[in-house]
Design a protein with these regions (language model features):
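Short, Lys/Arg-rich, polar N-terminal cytosolic tail immediately upstream
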Residues: 1-31
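A structural signal for multi-pass alpha-helical bundles of membrane permease subunits
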Residues: 28-32, 36-304
Length: 304
């Protein structure tokens, strides 16, 4: 009986030690998790402050009079709030520049997404002899500097008669967006299970039906990512617009910024008002499609 009693005591002590060890490990892991989350939160907060500070500076100073920045300081709230800067920007043809940019970016994005989808599908879903070569060529095209092509594109648009028109901007915008878009969309389409296509083929779908009914709808997140990423780049593009457009009535929004800067070289609040109105559409699009943007970027990075 003594031996049995001692054995029971040893087993109880062993169980208590195991429970204590598990509890200590749980506490340590919980502390480590809290520390990791705290560090991540601090870095995220720093990133948020660094990101929002320029926008806050731009926004509040766009509501000042011409020399109030020197008198009140750049990070103090305006006193009083001066709305005439926005009235002057709007009355000096801002929306004309704005809608021309919308047309150019909209048409360019539609063409770019259509071509990218048709190019990425065979590269991602079909095995043919030239597949690796074509894919490598497209990837290599991403390294071509945009400014190297300014003079050839200028001569080309002049020769074919579209220089100084919005049509001259659409071709370069689409061409320089395609390599990166095909690269990302190919990686995204490779993550789609092949069983989906196989089951559709069993039901009688051919290649075209597979693409339009299965692959394309499942690629909406990737297409949304490309639309936002390239849309921001096209919206802010200055080099081609400045080279290929000379008539003031045909200029897009980035050129309008230069024009307002030239007309109001000392009136900084008016320039900041133009910048504020220019970035609002892109911020709005990102807020609306941020879930699809993150999903598309993560899916494209999983497998390629």
């Amino acid at each position: 009986m003594i031996i049995t009693h001692e054995s029971e005591q040893n087993m109880v002590a062993l169980d208590n030690n195991q429970d204590t060890t598990i509890e200590n490990e749980y506490r340590k892991s919980k502390i480590k998790s809290r520390i990791a989350w705290t560090i991540a939160f601090i870095f995220a907060l720093i990133q948020l402050v660094l990101t929002l500070t320029p926008f806050f500076f731009m926004l509040i100073n766009s509501f000042r009079k011409q020399f109030d920045m020197l008198q009140q300081g750049v990070f103090h709230l305006p006193d009083p709030w001066y709305f005439m800067n926005y009235v002057e920007v709007v009355t000096h043809g801002f929306f004309g520049f704005f809608f021309r940019s919308v047309v150019v970016v909209g048409v360019s994005l539609v063409l770019m997404l259509i071509i990218s989808a048709f190019a990425a599908y065979p590269l991602a879903r079909m095995n043919f002899k030239l597949n690796p070569f074509i894919y490598a060529t497209i990837v290599a095209m991403m390294s071509v500097p945009m400014h190297v092509t300014l003079i050839p594109i200028f001569k080309l648009t002049t020769n074919i008669g579209i220089y100084d028109s919005l049509k001259a901007l659409i071709g370069p915008y689409v061409a320089f967006a395609l390599p990166m878009s095909v690269f990302i969309l190919t990686a995204f389409m490779k993550t789609i299970p092949k069983e989906i296509e196989e089951s559709a083929e069993i039901d009688g779908c051919n290649r075209y039906q597979n693409f339009f009914r299965m692959i394309l709808p499942l690629s909406k997140s990737g297409l949304s990512t490309l639309a936002i990423y390239n849309g921001v780049a096209m919206w802010n593009e200055f080099a081609f617009a400045n080279t290929l457009i000379i008539t003031p009535e045909k200029k897009t929004l980035p050129l309008a910024l230069g024009q307002f800067k030239g007309e109001h070289s000392l009136d900084i609040p008016i320039i900041l008002a133009v910048l504020t109105l220019s970035v609002l559409p892109m911020i709005s699009l990102f807020i609306i499609f941020q879930d699809k943007l993150v999903k598309g970027m993560m899916a494209g990075a999983v497998k390629g």
